[in-house]
């Protein structure tokens, strides 16, 4: 179910997040998250995960809630310094054939 441009979407969004975190433009939701701190961002990730669980159970709004969760996770990754590249590296490490066969937490 992969398609051309999927990575581009995540990279484009992550680039926008990095820009907003650096410039902190007035009215930016991303900038307001950063100003409230890591604790707030971490709570938002938990809140969005819970909303995605409910959506999955009801079958309503799954894509929208998944998008909200991914956005907040990307903000958290940017703020912690792990970044999108760190996430990609960890996912690659977990894939079968990654040298040690992965750690059983991936595909």
Predicted segments, located by residue:
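Flexible "arm" and connector segments at domain edges
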Residues: 1-66, 70-107
């Amino acid at each position: 179910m992969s398609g051309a441009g999927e990575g581009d979407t995540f990279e484009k969004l992550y680039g926008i997040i990095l820009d907003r975190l650096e410039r902190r433009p007035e009215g930016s939701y991303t900038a307001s998250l950063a100003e409230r701190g890591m604790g707030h961002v971490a709570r938002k990730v938990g809140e969005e995960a819970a909303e995605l669980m409910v959506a999955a159970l009801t079958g309503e709004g799954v894509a929208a809630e998944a998008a909200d969760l991914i956005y907040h996770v990307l903000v958290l990754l940017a703020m912690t310094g792990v970044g999108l590249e760190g996430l990609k590296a960890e996912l690659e490490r977990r894939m079968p054939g990654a040298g040690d066969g992965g750690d059983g937490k991936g595909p």
